[in-house]
Amino acid sequence: MSNKFPNNFIWGAATSSYQIEGASSIDGKGKSIWDTFSHTKGKVFNNQNADIATDHYNRYKEDVALMNNIKLKAYRFSISWPRIFPDGKGKFNKKGVDFYSKLLDELLKLSLIHI
C-alpha cells in the first residue's frame, strides 16, 4: 500500500449552499425548509442558524481565491433552490441566477472544475 496520492489525483472541496452562503433574506431569496427549521426555537443547538454562515454570497471571490491558493482543482457546490425560485416554482429570481453565474465565471477564471 502506498502512502502517496497518484500524480493525476484531483484535489477538490465540496460545500452546501445553506451552510456557507448566508445572505438568507437579501436579493429576493425565499425561505428554505432549513431556514424555517433553524428559526424554530429549541430545534437547533443554541438556536443557531445560517443567516450569515461564512457569507459566501458576498465573499465568493475571496473564497475562490483561497481555493486557488491551496491549489484545489475541483469544487462541488450546491445551488439554493429558494435563491433561484423564491416561491418554490414559477418565476425565477434573476439576482439568484446572477450570483451562480458570477461564481462559475470566477471558478472558470482560475480553471477550477465544477463537479
Regions found by a protein language model. Give the residues of each.
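N-terminal structural segment of carbohydrate-active enzymes
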Residues: S2-N93, V97, S101-L108
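Conserved small/polar residues in nucleotide/adenosyl-binding loops
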Residues: I113-I115
